[in-house]
């Protein structure tokens, strides 16, 4: 699932702690499992570039990953929730858009790897065992 969020609260888009919390809590809320703690970086503005800074973060999941890129000066955020497991994309969209105060959201949900998922049940059990669950 990809989300492009417009008209977001600019302070929230630059809030390292809030975005860490989003990446830390969302996986459990949508039935996924973190493989590692989230990593979140404040990105400073770059001279001679359209990039006026923001925050980039991601969390690696047993099921894949979630990433976020924010552009506070523009009130814009781009988020990917990539998973080899189905999840409630409507819930994820509403949770994220409310948290960031988005006025408009473009959502794309694409089913990928339909042949690969035949191997998934064994893989998730193995990954859970490795992660100590």
PLM feature spans:
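Polybasic/polar functional segments that serve as interface/processing modules
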Residues: 1-133
């Amino acid at each position: 699932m990809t989300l492009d969020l417009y008209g977001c609260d600019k302070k929230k888009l630059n809030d390292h702690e809030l975005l860490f919390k989003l990446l830390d809590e969302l996986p459990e809320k949508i039935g996924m499992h973190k493989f590692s703690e989230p990593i979140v970086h404040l990105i400073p503005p770059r001279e001679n570039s359209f990039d006026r800074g923001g925050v980039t973060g991601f969390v690696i999941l047993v099921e894949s990953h979630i990433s976020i890129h924010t552009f506070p000066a523009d009130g814009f955020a781009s988020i990917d929730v990539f998973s080899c497991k189905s999840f409630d994309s409507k819930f994820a969209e509403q949770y994220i858009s409310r948290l960031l105060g988005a006025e408009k959201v473009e959502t794309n949900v694409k089913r990928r790897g339909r042949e690969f998922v035949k191997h998934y049940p064994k893989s998730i059990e193995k990954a859970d065992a490795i992660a100590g669950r």
